[in-house]
């Protein structure tokens, strides 16, 4: 489901009012091969959120969530925890035993937003070297737009 809330905008270069041909908001449900469901949302109109980029994965026994605004931490909930200890725990993911982190600073020091692009470039170059596809692929990205 998509929606364009603002149907016309002034072109920044020409000053002419033009029809808007892109979506201001999108949401879709998906059904994964393993039987689980997914909900994806994006919008330009989430006031109060500056570049909000989050994911949350919930399962029968555990859940994880991550937020770009706090990209060095992953939150984890384990339903098997003892009742009096149940709750979300925060995992600092910049120690050297986490993927990619052995290539950066001493364990525990934070990385920034730009470091994630270095990781993407490394994955891309590794895929060229090995011949194995990295993910997401251009086709996967295109398929989300159909």
What function would you assign to each model-found segment?
Residues 1-51, 139:
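Rossmann-like dinucleotide-binding domain that binds NAD(P)(H)
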Residues 9, 49-54, 75-79, 85-88:
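A short, polar/proline- and glycine-enriched secondary-structure boundary/capping micro-motif
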Residues 31, 67-69:
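Short beta-strand micro-motifs enriched in acidic
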Residues 31-33, 58, 75-77:
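A generic structural motif
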Residues 43, 69, 76-79:
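Surface loops and adjacent helix of pleckstrin homology
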Residues 55-58, 82-146:
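C-terminal helical cap and adjacent loop that interface with cofactors, partners, or active-site loops
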């Amino acid at each position: 489901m998509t929606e364009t809330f603002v149907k016309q905008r002034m072109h920044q270069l020409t000053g002419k009012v033009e029809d808007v041909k892109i979506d201001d908001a999108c949401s879709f449900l998906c059904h994964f091969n393993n039987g689980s469901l997914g909900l994806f949302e994006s919008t330009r109109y989430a006031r109060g959120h500056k570049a909000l980029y989050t994911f949350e994965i919930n399962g029968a026994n555990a859940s994880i969530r991550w937020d770009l605004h706090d990209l060095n931490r992953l939150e984890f909930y384990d339903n098997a925890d003892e009742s009096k200890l149940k709750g979300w725990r925060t995992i600092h993911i910049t120690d050297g035993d986490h993927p990619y982190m052995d290539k950066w600073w001493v364990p525990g020091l934070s990385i920034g937003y730009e470091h994630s692009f270095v990781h993407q470039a490394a994955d891309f170059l590794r895929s060229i070297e090995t011949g194995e596809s990295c993910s997401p692929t251009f086709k996967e990205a295109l398929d989300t737009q159909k």
